[in-house]
């Protein structure tokens, strides 16, 4: 049984742990515990606000005017950081050094960022979602995704990327979604997607693709969705798509397809394909212009002899002169860098490799993160609804990470739970309550 007077000490202890006595949350921000969350979104901050608690796990700083990030701005306890739609132009290479708990990092819609150091994301062993869309990136340095074995969602859409070197994604053995649409890619080499053995969705539409190596998709045995529409492709060999044994949704429309003899292998592959595909409208020859390649007959290829197009079959090595010649037709939006260093390791021999079919990412608050962002990628796919949409519903497609539309106006629905702490601009709000409790304690004595 408690002493009669001990209730005073007990009340004071509870008060000290629960009331905001003049600090603990940055000015103009909202904070709440379990997990410790700081929301400073849309407050016109030009720099990271001071006073972010050291134990903060979730930090929301989107829709401000922050210009740079450096070491010391955040604590390694951080699990989630949303800092999209700011004015970030520079991220110090060691900004996230030691952040072994970080799982979700949204840097999207910082249109003046343009370049990243190779070591920017080094050591983020638990990172499972990385957003780099609309960042003005023209190139990605070799090794930038090295060691990110837990990464599942990578958003690189709507940048100015012209070229991706072989093995740029080789360490991403658990990646399931790769969004590269809305860039300026004009070719896909043999080793670009090497090692992506768990990739489920690959979006490459609205680039400038003219050429795809016939082994570009060699490792993508689990891919279910491939979008290649609105590019500059004229041909694509059936051998290129043959490894995609799990493919369900394919979009090839919006290209100037040559439906002559060079299209025979693609036509044969499409005849065998049992998934849903868009139309493949012919641009040439003139007599087939406007026809759907899928609907051509055997008789249309009866006079075709010899091997399929050597343009796609040969092992094509992109030389510096090749790239320079291509860039004359597609001016760069920034200096592209080719720093590829093929690793040469089979998927099973790389450190951190996990067997296909397992979701190996383990983190503390997956349900919360997924709930906050549910509905994003469904919107993405509906935005580019294929002309075969009547054959299936996007609502029954596998659950996946969403994409935000437009200006990235996602706002965190902060509802003040018990223990909410609102930063104050003057006198501590707990003082009157403290006086009342002390008076009650004296009365009880």
Swiss-Prot record:
A GO cellular component term found in this entry reads: membrane raft
Q: Which terms are listed as keywords in the entry?
A: Cell membrane, Cell projection, Glycoprotein, GPI-anchor, Heparin-binding, Leucine-rich repeat, Lipoprotein, Membrane, Receptor, Repeat, Signal, Transmembrane, Transmembrane helix
Q: Which residues form the signal peptide?
A: 1-24
Tell me where the LRR repeats sit in this chain.
Answer: 55-76, 77-98, 101-123, 126-147, 150-171, 174-195, 198-219, 222-243
Give the knockout phenotype: No visible phenotype. Mice are born at the expected Mendelian rate, are viable and fertile. Compared to wild-type littermates, cultured hippocampus neurons from mutant mice display an increased number of excitatory synapses. Likewise, mice with a triple gene disruption that lack Rtn4r, Rtn4rl1 and Rtn4rl2 have no visible phenotype, are healthy and viable.
**PROSITE patterns (alphabetical):** LRR (PS51450)
Question: Mind telling me which residues form the propeptide?
Answer: 425-445
One annotated GO biological process: negative regulation of axon regeneration
> Could you tell me what this protein does?
Cell surface receptor that plays a functionally redundant role in postnatal brain development and in regulating axon regeneration in the adult central nervous system. Contributes to normal axon migration across the brain midline and normal formation of the corpus callosum. Protects motoneurons against apoptosis; protection against apoptosis is probably mediated by MAG. Plays a role in inhibiting neurite outgrowth and axon regeneration via its binding to neuronal chondroitin sulfate proteoglycans. Binds heparin.
Under Gene Ontology molecular function, one entry of this record is: signaling receptor activity
The entry assigns this protein to a family as follows:
Belongs to the Nogo receptor family.
Topology versus the membrane: Lipid-anchor; GPI-anchor
Q: In which tissues is it expressed?
A: Detected in brain (at protein level). Detected in retina ganglion cell layer and inner nuclear layer.
Listed under subunit, the entry gives: Identified in a complex that contains RTN4R, RTN4RL1 and NGFR; the interaction depends on the presence of chondroitin sulfate proteoglycans. Does not interact with MAG, OMG and RTN4.
| Annotated LRRNT domain residues | 25-54
Q: Where is this region: Disordered?
A: 307-377, 401-424
SUPFAM superfamilies linked: L domain-like
TM ranges are 424-444
What's the protein name?
Answer: Reticulon-4 receptor-like 1
Q: Does the keyword Glycoprotein apply?
A: yes
Supply the InterPro entries for this chain. Leu-rich_rpt, Leu-rich_rpt_typical-subtyp, LRR_dom_sf, LRR_TM_domain-containing
Its source organism is Mus musculus
Quick one: where's the GPI-anchor amidated serine lipidation?
Answer: 424
The UniProt record lists the LRRCT domain at 255-306
Q: Which PANTHER family match?
A: ANTIGEN BSP, PUTATIVE-RELATED, RETICULON 4 RECEPTOR LIKE 1
**Bias (Basic residues) ranges:** 352-366, 401-413
What Pfam families does the record point to?
A: LRR_8
